[in-house]
């Protein structure tokens, strides 16, 4: 693996999440192909793409910004999960189990992304300079 992001466990987990989201998207009715199904796929894919983009050649502050975008994309995917559940698009026991698993995985991934953001936040904090202080 030649890129920094390829070594990140959180990125690897986000790929698994995206894969599972694609599986759910395939279960949705044809009428949702270009709406909810597409939205779920794009949101889930955006999680790993932003982790990757932010990790390569960026400052900690910039990487933190991309992780924030990644986290918001994950939340968007979770909102899609709620819509899928509310519309009863996953109605068999196996499909319900897959949807519940995707939700749990989102919780775990969100915690990992936030932990990474917190670790970066500590490295970008700089002391405030008081330019008007007397020497």
Residue ranges with predicted function:
Residues 1-53, 57-135:
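Short, C-terminally biased terminal segments at protein or domain edges
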